Curated annotation (Swiss-Prot):
Aerial growth, conidiation, and dispersal of filamentous fungi in the environment rely upon a capability of their secreting small amphipathic proteins called hydrophobins (HPBs) with low sequence identity. Class I can self-assemble into an outermost layer of rodlet bundles on aerial cell surfaces, conferring cellular hydrophobicity that supports fungal growth, development and dispersal; whereas Class II form highly ordered films at water-air interfaces through intermolecular interactions but contribute nothing to the rodlet structure. Induction: Expression is repressed during growth in liquids, whereas several days of growth under aerial conditions of solid culture induces expression. This is Class I hydrophobin rodA. SMART domains: HYDRO. One of its GO terms (molecular function) is structural constituent of cell wall.
Length: 164
């Protein structure tokens, strides 16, 4: 009985130690994305502050659509060191292991349109960072739909900040 209680306490202590650190306080150190300590912490490839929607759309080209994506998962977030002849074989088959989260997969994306102002004589510059605070990506124009897919991937996207 005494062994099981100490094993339980040790297990709980190991769980607490393994938890990721809590979120930093608002405005404190570490609350930004590492580029001037500003913005969303989930944005890996930031874009310049003075880039407009028109410039970003031109960078994407005519074969891709400028999009704002709420979620992005990048490969290389985890690293597993496997030893032995068949070390890691099962984990690689079931989809875990190094880079298991994908190769820059973007999810929950919405289209960013270039809005033409009503008054043509007044130049209005829509800054891309004002339109989208999440991941800005160039998504391939394709008629595919991922609504009822098993994998759920419809549009291959590339982070805009990675091609600048």
């Amino acid at each position: 009985m005494q062994f099981s209680i100490s094993a339980l306490v040790l297990g709980l202590a190991a769980t607490v130690y393994a938890l990721p650190p809590g979120a930093p306080s608002a405005g404190g150190a570490g609350s930004g994305n590492g580029v001037g300590n500003k913005g969303n912490t989930d944005v890996r490839f930031s874009v310049p502050d003075n880039m407009t929607v028109k410039q970003a759309q031109a960078k994407c080209g005519d074969q891709a659509q400028l999009s704002c994506c709420n979620k992005a998962v990048y490969a290389g977030d985890t690293t597993d060191i496997n030893s032995g002849i068949l070390g890691g074989t099962l984990s690689n088959l079931i989809g875990s292991g190094s880079g298991a989260s994908g190769l820059g997969l973007f999810d929950q994306c919405s289209k960013l349109d270039l809005q033409i102002p009503v008054l043509i004589g007044i130049p209005i510059q829509d800054l891309i960072n004002q339109k989208c605070k999440q991941n800005i990506a160039c998504c391939q124009n394709s008629p595919s739909s991922a609504n009822s897919d098993l994998i759920g991937l419809g549009l291959p996207c590339v982070a805009l900040g990675s091609i600048l």
